[in-house]
């Protein structure tokens, strides 16, 4: 099965290269797609330079998809998913710290071996703040592999912005698709407050949680509606 890694990135020029360096070392990947989500910094230039540097190597090719305006994480992920013909796609955040090739393989294998429709990477042993967040809400992890057609069929997924992971989780639960939670040791990511400063970081985090809440309410309602329709058919 063809496998593509998709890296949605917004203003990640200082961090994205270390993630790409790891992804190109994973033997299970056939291509890597960076989706530059309307960044205002040099994210596109860094990714394109990396792609050129590795073009002649035996590593999986890297290509950069530039979105003219910011569509949010869900929009960037959808753009990447529809830009490939890979049967399996894997999403990785552009600000990861401690990612290793074996982490990538561990997340991919349950899907490639036909055990599940989606595998979600859950941080452990990175640092307390991200470990705690993923213990409390592992279903919003951005590191996951899944069958591509199951992602692109989700209604409105391209409009979910930061709520994309909760939308994915609710949709898969509603459809009873099998999902595996895969522990990945030693990974964390750069916090918004570290990227933007305390005040702007807190505001960005608040906005992110609001988008997650909106997606939760929308897809939870869709789940309730489907359940009611099924009950009505059975009457």
Where do the language-model regions lie?
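Cell-envelope/extracellular polymer assembly enzymes that use nucleotide-activated donors
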Residues: 2-4, 31, 167
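Short, well-formed alpha-helical segments that are part of the catalytic scaffolds
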Residues: 12-25
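A conserved acidic beta->alpha catalytic loop
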Residues: 36-45
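Glycine-rich, basic loop-to-helix element that forms the pyrophosphate-binding segment
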Residues: 67-84
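Short aromatic/hydrophobic "clamp" motif used to bind/position activated sugar donors
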Residues: 89
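Conserved donor-nucleotide/metal-binding helix-loop-beta segment in metal-dependent transferases, i.e.
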Residues: 101-120
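Short beta-strand-to-loop element that shapes/binds the nucleotide-sugar donor at the catalytic cleft/hinge
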Residues: 119-133
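Hydrophobic helical membrane-anchoring modules
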Residues: 159, 173-235
